[in-house]
UniProtKB/Swiss-Prot annotation:
The keyword Transport does not apply. InterPro entries: Ribosomal_bL12 (IPR000206), Ribosomal_bL12_C (IPR013823), Ribosomal_bL12_C/ClpS-like (IPR014719), Ribosomal_bL12_oligo (IPR008932), Ribosomal_bL12_oligo_N_sf (IPR036235). The gene is rpl12. Pfam families: Ribosomal_L12 (PF00542), Ribosomal_L12_N (PF16320). This is Large ribosomal subunit protein bL12c. The keyword Ribosomal protein applies. Forms part of the ribosomal stalk which helps the ribosome interact with GTP-bound translation factors. Is thus essential for accurate translation.
Amino acid sequence: MSSKTDEILEQLKGLTLIEAADLVKAIEEAFGVDASAPVGGGMVMMAPAAGGGADAAEEKSAFDLVLEEVPADKKIAVLKVVRSLTNLGLKEAKDLVEATPKVVKEGASKDELKQLKKNLKQLEQK
């Protein structure tokens, strides 16, 4: 890091909680961002399925479903969704959920992903 960033870091370390909260609010207003981004159920990332050098303008029809992380309080519910999606046994699904990030399904269609997204949204509400 540069000396300027080191100096800023040292100044930040000296802030009280109230000063830090005020700083966060000021940064949010100045840059138009929200520091309270939602942290919800299992984070799922859709990665394009491996399949050569397709044209970028062509719409993807198959995706790899990657499970990024699973909050401890949602593990059982995510495990059920993974089992229904992959037809794995309980032990295999548990190992997959605990070894994130992991590809859950390869070559999934958009419809499958929409259904999974719906299932995960329901998990977040429970």
